[in-house]
From Swiss-Prot:
The lineage of its organism: Bacteria, Pseudomonadati, Pseudomonadota, Gammaproteobacteria, Pseudomonadales. A divalent metal cation binds at H97, H107, H146, H176. One of its GO terms (cellular component) is cytoplasm. This is Oxygen-dependent coproporphyrinogen-III oxidase. The active site is at H107. One of its GO terms (molecular function) is coproporphyrinogen oxidase activity.
C-alpha cells in the first residue's frame, strides 16, 4: 500500500469514528454495532449499523477498502482506457433514515480510487459528496445545508460549489419519474484536477462538513409532532430512495459488480417503505408542496 493510500485510509477510518460518535450522541439511545468483514477477492471493511434509536430508525456508516486485478464495468465504463488495470478503492459511505418524517434522510460518501498497471503511471481520483432528502421541507434547513456545502468548497475556488451542486442535481435524478431524489448538495467524481495534496484536502473538507450540515437540522426537527398520515407519506417517499439506489447509484453498482459485501452495500435501504399505485398528493397539501417547491432545480443561496 502506497503512502498516499495509507494517508487516505487513516483519514477515512477516523472520519467513520467521528461521524458514528456524533450520531450516537445526537440519538441519545442507540449505538452502532460493528461488523468487520473481509472480501475473498481482496480487501475488507467495517460496517457499522444503528437501528431503532430514539431518533434514527436505521442508519449505516461504512468503511471499505477493496482491491482487485481488474476494474469492474461500473468504474471503467466512462474511462475505457482503464479497463484491465488493477485497482484499490477506499471509501466511507453513510445513509441515515430517521423515524420522524420532519427529519430528512441524509447520505454522504467520500472515496478514493487508484488504478495501476505495470510500467505505467498510476491513475488516481477522488469522488463523493453529500445530499439531503426531506419529506416535509423547511427552507431554513435547505439553505443551511447548502451554505455549509458552499463554505466547504470555497477555499478551492468560487466555481467549485456551483459546479458540484449542479452535478448533484443532475446525478440524484430519477429519470424514470423525472423528479429529483431530494434537495441536493454536492456530488463529484474523477477529482484529480489539482495535485494530490490539494485533492485530498478537498475530500477532507467535504467529509468533515457533513456533521456540521446535518446535525443542526436533526436537532431542530427531531422532537416535532407528526401524524400517522405523515409517517405513511415518509414511507411512500422512501420508495423513491430505494428506486434510485437500486437502479442508478454508482456506489451500489460498483459494490455489487466488484463482488462487494451485499449486506454492507444494501444497508442504505430504509427499513419500512411503501408503494401506492399512481398515488398523488392532495392539491395544496404539505405533501404536494414537497414536489412543487422543494424538489425543483433551485438555487437555495440566491436570496439568502
Amino acid at each position: 500500500m502506497s503512502t498516499r493510500t495509507e494517508a487516505v485510509k487513516a483519514y477515512l477510518l477516523d472520519l467513520q469514528d467521528r461521524i458514528c460518535t456524533a450520531l450516537e450522541q445526537e440519538d441519545g439511545n442507540a449505538h452502532f454495532v460493528e461488523d468487520a468483514w473481509t472480501r475473498p477477492a481482496g480487501g475488507g471493511g467495517r460496517t457499522r449499523v444503528i437501528e431503532n434509536g430514539a431518533v434514527i430508525e436505521k442508519g449505516g456508516v461504512n468503511f471499505s477498502h477493496v482491491f482487485g486485478s481488474n476494474l469492474p464495468p461500473s468504474a471503467s465504463a466512462h474511462r475505457p482506457e482503464l479497463a484491465g488495470r488493477g485497482f484499490e478503492a477506499l471509501g466511507v459511505s453513510l445513509v441515515i433514515h430517521p423515524h420522524n418524517p420532519h427529519v430528512p434522510t441524509s447520505h454522504a460518501n467520500v472515496r478514493f480510487f487508484i488504478a495501476e498497471k505495470e510500467g505505467e503511471e498510476p491513475v488516481w481520483w477522488f469522488g463523493g459528496g453529500f445530499d439531503l432528502t426531506p419529506y416535509y421541507g423547511v427552507e431554513e434547513d435547505c439553505v443551511h445545508w447548502h451554505r455549509v456545502a458552499e463554505r466547504a468548497c470555497a477555499p478551492f475556488g468560487d466555481d467549485v460549489y456551483p459546479r458540484y451542486k449542479a452535478w448533484c442535481d443532475s446525478y440524484f435524478h430519477l429519470k424514470h419519474r423525472d423528479e429529483p431524489r431530494g434537495i441536493g448538495g454536492l456530488f463529484f467524481d474523477d477529482v484529480n484536477q489539482w495535485d494530490f495534496d490539494t485533492s485530498f484536502a478537498f475530500i477532507r473538507a467535504i467529509g468533515d462538513a457533513f456533521i456540521n450540515a446535518y446535525l443542526p437540522i436533526v436537532r431542530r426537527r427531531k422532537a416535532a409532532a407528526y401524524t400517522a398520515q405523515q409517517r405513511e407519506f415518509q414511507e411512500f417517499r422512501r420508495g423513491r430512495y430505494v428506486e434510485f439506489n437500486l437502479v442508478y447509484d454508482r456506489g451500489t453498482l460498483f459494490g455489487l459488480q466488484s463482488g462487494g459485501r451485499t449486506e454492507s452495500i444494501l444497508m442504505s435501504l430504509p427499513p419500512q417503505v411503501r408503494w401506492g399505485y399512481d398515488w398523488k398528493a392532495a392539491p395544496g397539501s404539505e405533501e404536494a408542496r414537497l414536489t412543487e417547491y422543494f424538489l425543483t432545480d433551485r438555487d437555495w443561496l440566491a436570496d439568502n
